[in-house]
Amino acid sequence: MRDEINQGVYMEEITINGNTWQKYKGDEGQDVFIAKFMIPADDLLGKYVDESFYDVLIDNDADVYLPPECDMTKSQDCDNICLKCMDESRLAFKFRKNVFTPEEQLGAFEGLYDSAVESNNRGMAAGPRVEQSGHRDWVTPFQQDILEYYASGQPTPVDGSNPIETIIEKHKTKQHETRGSVWLRSKIEGEFGVYTGFFDVAMERFASMPVDEATEYVKDIRKNMISDTSYASPMWSGIAGFYGRYPRIPYGRETSYVEHNREKFEKCYPFARKLDKEFARLIPGRYAKQKEFADRLDKKFLIGEDTTLTTITVNTTTSDRNARMACHRDAGSLNEGFSNLTVITKDGKSWKGGYLVAPEVRAAINIQPGDLLLIDNMRVIHGNTPIEAPDSGIEDMLRMSLIFYFREDMDKLGTWDYEKTRREYVDSRRLNKEHELWRPFWNGVSPSMWHNEEWYDYLKAKDKGLEWLEDYHPEALEEKTTLEGFFE
């Protein structure tokens, strides 16, 4: 440990397991850590972390910065004191204890708890999948490799090794992937009689067949007995708030949960407003950037209509739900802004563990109900340690984590009424059996649908049609020599 005085600040240098941080007290009495290292951790994406992945456990107010972007060993005027190089661009996270009142937490709990359902859309965050999970029968990497070997005509290794034994050895310790296909159980049972143990029987069949016959048989299994939909490991997760456009749903909108539970959702507004206020106070530069985007957006797409937040990811862990996160970077939130993490509970129910770990800087945070973590979750790899039941028993396990953010794709939206009109237009096409593109199960969407006369004519019939054409479709007006007769 080395102590120094720099710019009137008492600074100490801490080294643990060969990793070094500079540490000093901030202007609010918080601990400030500056990592002088950055450990590559992309190989951890999709994998779980435990206590071996951090050296510093933070459970009091703290700021943690990534190392300076400069090369300290080559800078002639560098005094090896990183304080003067730190700004919001190097901030990994800020952690503050006891930010939210019990009333604010209760409102968030009641307003958001029911939005979390079993989900397969969390990708890396969902963690490694197991052979049977969430009512799905996964095609394991081992099974995939066996099928590939036989489908490829049983190629002979140049080293003379047994390819089946090589595949078995390869998968003895290898972690499963985070996303994959599933077996169609009904098809498997129709072919093999029972699902349990069928792959051992299948391997015996493959081995007993001539090469060409085995190849065709395996190709048939791949085609007809495996779903072509890719799934992630299931976890209890949900989205509340608002969405931007999506290719198959090309209009801004409320999430399904908010659309059907608006009054309940509004209970989270005081919590969201407190979070937004603390964001502005603690990271004013990044907040100002996010506010620029929020000010361009129709306020009806903002949570509470007065924050810089559009969307909330909700994850829950109870006695029968597990929301442990594998290592991941988040996507979709505004790059110029900043994200966050909070956890809440109800009736004093708690948990053990569940530390959020940032393995690149070897730090973990013990987030408890009422605390606020502001984190650069698009840049910093993070996951959490196992979440365990309290001493009172598994039935008292209850943990809900919330991530509030501004969705970057929402910057492309028009006004609330314009986006609503886009939705009405899609629905009108979908329900119109006389439409030239109509077919069973058509969703009403087609290529170039927003740049043709059918859409322009639809807008003409609306009170704000001319205004919307001028704002969002000037090309429609350019096609007319005058506006006279435009609304014929």
Spans of features found by a protein language model:
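Catalytic core of Fe(II)/2-oxoglutarate
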Residues: 337, 346-488
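A subset of signal/propeptide-processing and intrinsically disordered low-complexity segments
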Residues: 50, 323-325, 458
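Fe(II)/2-oxoglutarate
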Residues: 1-240, 483
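Active-site-proximal segments of catalytic enzyme domains
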Residues: 241, 247-389, 394, 398-403
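A broadly conserved detector of short glycine/acidic/proline-rich loop/turn motifs that flank catalytic sites
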Residues: 87, 97-99, 318, 379, ...
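Context-gated lysine
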Residues: 23-25, 36, 47, 74, ...
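Charge-centric, low-complexity intrinsically disordered segments used as regulatory activation/interaction regions
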Residues: 2-19, 27, 34-35, 108-112, ...
